[in-house]
Swiss-Prot record:
Its EC number is 5.6.1.7. The keyword Kinase does not apply. SUPFAM superfamilies: GroEL apical domain-like (SSF52029), GroEL equatorial domain-like (SSF48592), GroEL-intermediate domain like (SSF54849). ATP binds at T29, L30, G31, P32, D86, G87, T88, T89, T90, G413, N476, A477, A478, D492. This is Chaperonin GroEL. Together with its co-chaperonin GroES, plays an essential role in assisting protein folding. The GroEL-GroES system forms a nano-cage that allows encapsulation of the non-native substrate proteins and provides a physical environment optimized to promote and accelerate protein folding. It comes from Streptococcus equi subsp. zooepidemicus (strain MGCS10565). Its main location: cytoplasm. It comes from the Bacteria. Disulfide bonds: none annotated. It holds the Pfam family Cpn60_TCP1. One of its GO terms (molecular function) is ATP binding. Transmembrane segments: none annotated.
Amino acid sequence: MAKDIKFSADARESMVRGVDILADTVKVTLGPKGRNVVLEKAFGSPLITNDGVTIAKEIELEDHFENMGAKLVSEVASKTNDIAGDGTTTATVLTQAIVREGLKNVTAGANPIGIRRGIEAATTTAVEALKAVAQPVSGKEAIAQVASVSSRSEKVGDYISEAMERVGNDGVITIEESRGMETELEVVEGMQFDRGYLSQYMVTDNEKMVADLENPFILITDKKISNIQDILPLLEEVLKTSRPLLIIADDVDGEALPTLVLNKIRGTFNVVAVKAPGFGDRRKAMLEDIAVLTGGTVITEDLGLELKDATMAALGQAAKVTVDKDNTVIVEGAGSSEAISNRVSLIKSQLETTTSEFDREKLQERLAKLAGGVAVIKVGAATETELKEMKLRIEDALNATRAAVEEGIVAGGGTALINVMDKVAALELDGDAATGRNIVLRALEEPVRQIAYNAGYEGSVIIDKLKNSAAGVGFNAATGEWVDMIATGIIDPVKVTRSALQNAASVAGLILTTEAVVATKPEPAAPAMPQGMDPGMMGGF
């Protein structure tokens, strides 16, 4: 396949046109007065959103060289979203500013490598300065503030802060679509997995069709139970205690299931059987999680254990277990806090090393089920379009809040970036590296400039006054007032701000040091069949 190649200034300028098209589309959404962008969808109604990464992912340009520039900026937004969950528009604005200023200097004869070195040094200094002024976030009110700023809704802020308070910082908070118009919060305490009872005759509440087990023993195994004789000695021991039993196994079939059901119906003992959650290696890991949580042992051939030899000591325990046709919830497992803490640490270390997004998601779920619980924010809205937009805003707010709890907060609205300019300006560099530093200094102003512009103010006037104000005092674009940003609740998570700057500087440096761009030439369209020609003449049928 033939390739099209451009060199030097021609190559960079083509890519920068793509950068500008994407950035100009995304940056209109920045700030409290940011506008929306309407995205056409192949199916269904258009999507109206102000989420930077969602917009960036949708943009595909006809010119291959321009498209490469656009895709590099889209990568900045995606990377920032992956790391911090928010700040994608800020990252896009910073990238455009660094690229635009950098290109002017490279065109004027500056060495791109020297400029890149200066950009990297200035970015490192700015990030260190941001971390130095960060304030920790703790308490329900502070968390609600962060979420409210990100989502532009106090109500959403309250939902997220309550969810984090209920399930902890390591808990899973999922966002689902509600069937009604109201947004609501639902919290599931304890460990929940998506496996229900194997027989409806095991229920204890016929009206709700659920099985409630108070203070049960829990048998955990990765084996299939087909012969009741395999677990008969254990059942007899449990029967003596008059306590219910939950069986978690690969499957319960053959004569074993009807025997258990029959004894349940007769009232001999209260037993519920469910299939083990997950598949393959993940199933083994999840069974081990349940064992740690309940203080039991997984009966598995991997450890040389057999069901017929199992004793009461191998059984886990919990304060309560609730099983319906789809889910099982274990509340207040009897496992030791030390064992649970060690298991949590192990999962966290696996989270740090995994490169798979799917594995990361599953590990995060396992961590939440052990460490906290699961909260579900059910988003309601009048129309499907509003629902999609609201869901994206809540996802951003949740990610920003987690980032704030993790690394702290700084003054929002781009104020923190202006406040660290003195530290960057004091960086002693010379030649083209000094030019790179000055490019970053100019770029640090850009988020404030764009926020002001979107709110109908002159950015240069706002920036000039901001530079002469006390640290932390900034411009509230929503009201047009000058306020103490943190005290007013206008804050940005450090993780979001630094990730946006680091990713922007990284990709902008790559674009500026690009000397050749190779793109695939579009293939010429196949010639159309002459009108009136019979397909049968060409061997058609």
